[in-house]
A protein has these predicted regions:
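Glycoside hydrolase catalytic-domain context in secreted enzymes
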Residues: 1-80, 88-98, 103, 125-562
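Short beta-strand elements
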Residues: 105-127
Length: 562
């Protein structure tokens, strides 16, 4: 392992590592670079082994060598101080940078010294390219939990790992717990300074006119001015496995399909070939392979007329029983995030937007739609649970996110402004749409709350009053407009619009559905005609024949004049 080199202008750090195949057969190997940061007892919590970056060799024949250059950003050495600075901090001291065969076994080690502590807390000194300063957003998610600390050589181990003594939420957290039953849109607007947006304008633009334009291009305002409130509600509410056509602006009905390792259309039953699981892709440590995975998804999406892919998924493997472990990559956020970023880049190079999911802290399937609350602290969130998503957005360039069913502390993840606005959009600079996980209400999902707090599209397959924004004041309509912008921006930059404005068409399954529905209606009408005819025939047969010169008396009996 060479000495560490640093580009002070960009913050890029690197080391050269030579790998030699000393075995008897050809094979590949992985170079993993870790750091062991300086730790002060009782100070910022730090792990002694943190994966910074990795690379994989080519196929090496016996006796063959290859020198790999492994790079990472200096900011990756920083830790998040959620207690005092409430920001990322790169503490002064010696950082042990090592090449390892795994997180435990050191092969070679160098020292990198930071002379002065650096706190990333000003607009001209943000962490890892953040657009704004990263600061505490999730204090309420900490809950009534004792977290394990390294202080005193893990002196609180017994307390932190003891069984809970109470299964009741504190009154303070109960007071903050938000669901549909206690959500008040009017109260949410109390301090709003929003003005009513223009709607229904006749500017003559179609969505294809904006393909490839920046998110903030002035033409977007002109296009959005053309939408009516009804059209915007249609757009955000019918997001089950695609987004609907809006003919007035040339918006196609596009298909988005599920499958972490394939593409599966729930309506047509058509699926692509299956690819290896996320766990297998992560285990290869092969970025090129992950990119090829995304490329294959993109190619098959074209064959299936698909625009969006409900994957990759990148929550953390915390324990063996998590219900979605098969979809998630790793217990390490850098490994997971790096592989995810390559899959996204591969798919999006083919014009297919990948929904990075389930954002965030999705950890179990049991009770997943029963207001399941996940509790953690800010440092763990930023350094572990959000980190792979951050890499997927910043390095992978993700344009779509699927939020999670669970709560983060007392707030639903799919309507959490700290997560979806402050961190995702403001800090990381995400541009695109946020889709809910399956939308069926569950007592806490409603479109009004979701769109006001950073969500955009409801993964709904049936019409429900809660899937539209019903409080149509200035703030409500502004939220609809923002959500519409995010959806339309993502779709306009998909392969469906790569050649400009296409003809507004429908999917084959929609026509099939209409034909089946029409046939059913005609069959019912035919049965109704048959039933009416039979009824009239029976009624005619039941009429009493009255002979000439007969009359009916008041009692209804028949009399005949002699």
């Amino acid at each position: 392992m060479s000495d560490i080199s640093v580009d002070e202008a960009t913050g890029t750090m690197s080391a050269d590592v030579t790998v030699t195949n000393t075995g008897q057969v050809a094979g590949k190997d992985i170079v993993q670079i870790y750091d062991n940061p300086p730790y002060t007892d009782g100070g910022i919590e730090k792990a002694s082994a943190n994966l910074l970056s990795y690379e994989k060799t080519k196929l090496l024949e016996p006796g063959e060598s290859e020198t790999l250059t492994v790079t990472w950003n200096r900011d990756s050495l920083a830790s998040y101080d959620a207690v005092n600075a409430k920001a990322y901090v790169l503490e002064a001291g010696d950082y042990k940078i090592s090449a390892r065969s795994n997180s435990h076994d050191v092969i070679d080690e160098k020292t990198y010294t930071v002379d002065v502590t650096q706190t990333f807390n000003t607009a001209d000194n943000t962490h890892d390219g953040d657009k704004v300063v990263a600061t505490n957003q999730f204090d309420d998610a900490k809950g009534d939990v004792t977290y394990l600390s390294r202080a005193g050589r893990f002196a609180n181990l017994a307390e932190a790992t003891a069984a809970p003594t109470s299964f009741e939420m504190s009154e303070a957290n109960k007071a903050k717990f938000l669901a549909t039953s206690n959500y008040d849109a009017a109260a949410a607007d109390a301090d709003s300074s929003a003005t009513m947006p223009t709607t229904g304008a006749k500017n003559g633009l179609v969505l294809g006119d904006l393909a490839g334009l920046d998110y903030d291009d002035p033409k977007w305002d002109q296009l959005l001015d053309q939408l009516t409130v009804k059209e915007m509600n249609t757009l955000i509410s019918k997001g089950g496995y695609g987004s609907p056509a809006i003919s007035s602006i040339g918006k196609l009905r596009v298909s988005d399909v599920d499958g972490p390792a394939s593409l599966n259309n729930n309506f047509t039953g058509v699926g692509s070939i299956g690819l290896p699981s996320a766990v297998s892709v992560a285990a290869t440590f092969n970025k090129e392979l992950a990119h090829s995975f995304g490329d294959a998804i993109g190619t098959m999406a074209h064959d299936m007329q698909v625009s969006g892919w409900y994957a990759p998924a990148t929550n953390t493997h915390r324990y063996a029983y998590a219900g979605r472990n098969f979809e998630y990559f790793s217990e390490d956020p850098v490994l997971a995030g790096s592989q995810v970023a390559e899959e996204i880049k591969g798919a999006q190079a083919k014009g297919v937007y990948a929904f990075l999911k389930h954002f965030a802290l999705n950890d179990q399937e049991t009770n997943r739609t029963h207001m399941l609350a996940t509790w953690t602290n800010e440092q763990a969130m930023r350094e572990i649970y959000l980190r792979s998503f951050e890499i997927g957005v910043k390095d992978g360039g993700a344009h779509a996110i699927m939020s999670a069913f669970n709560y983060i502390g007392p707030e639903y993840a799919g309507a959490n402004p700290a997560l979806l606005k402050n961190v995702l959009r403001d800090e990381w600079g995400f541009r695109g749409m946020v889709l809910t996980d399956y939308f069926a209400g569950y007592g806490y999902q409603n479109a009004d709350q979701i769109t006001r707090n950073g969500g955009d599209l409801m993964l709904a397959t049936i019409d429900m009053p809660i899937s539209t924004v019903n409080v149509q004041d200035a703030a409500g309509v502004s939220s609809l407009r923002r959500a519409s912008h995010n959806i339309l921006y993502t779709v306009a930059n998909s392969w469906m619009y790569e050649n400009g404005q296409p003809e507004v068409t429908r999917n084959a399954w929609e026509y099939i559905t209409w034909v089946v529905a029409a046939a059913a209606i005609l069959a019912l009408l035919g049965l109704e005609v048959v039933a009416i005819r039979r009824y009239r025939t029976r009624k005619a047969e039941a009429v009493i024949t009255v002979e000439p010169n007969a009359s009916i008396d008041e009692a209804g009996s028949e009399t005949v004049e002699e």
